[in-house]
Regions:
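Intrinsically disordered, low-complexity regulatory regions enriched in serine/threonine/proline
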Residues: 1-9, 28-146
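Short secondary-structure junctions
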Residues: 15-26
Length: 146
């Protein structure tokens, strides 16, 4: 599997979890938040980095809609990525059988991406993630959530 095939596989799996494709990324939204998945191709090797960005509706008196600029921006109000345990799934410089890569990507979605984004689609969920130490909130974002 090469990186292009991987992106197609990522797209198929993301869609099974109700992520919509737009502007080279994927998103899921609620009335309170917008969750974005962005695969960023490295300039230093044959690998991707997964950026998970959450934008909170109403923060700084703004409404956030999926756009190329928003999907490709480096930072959301809340940011995450793939966990250390799954970093190798995105690295094509390290050999891995296609079937194993596919299964591990599915596992990453079920164990991390889906639970994290589902929780982060609400202000209360974001507060819970911060209380558990799963995310860090800048003081300005924390104040906006109060």
């Amino acid at each position: 599997m090469d990186s292009k095939d991987f992106k197609t596989l990522f797209d198929e799996i993301a869609k099974t979890y109700d992520f919509k494709k737009a502007f080279g990324g994927w998103y899921k939204d609620s009335s309170e938040c917008l969750a974005i998945l962005d695969l960023q191709k490295s300039n230093f090797g044959d690998y991707y980095q997964l950026n998970i960005k959450i934008f909170i509706q109403g923060v700084f008196e703004k409404t956030y809609l999926p756009s190329k600029d928003l999907i490709k921006k480096s930072m959301g109000h809340v940011n995450s990525g793939e966990t250390k345990d799954y970093k190798d799934v995105f690295d094509f410089d390290k050999p891995m059988k296609d079937e194993i890569r596919k299964e591990r990507l599915k596992e990453l979605f079920t164990k991390h991406i889906v639970p994290f984004t589902n929780e982060a689609l609400s202000r209360a969920g974001i507060r819970r993630l911060a209380e558990k130490g799963d995310i860090f909130l800048l003081s300005t974002i924390r104040e906006e959530l109060s």
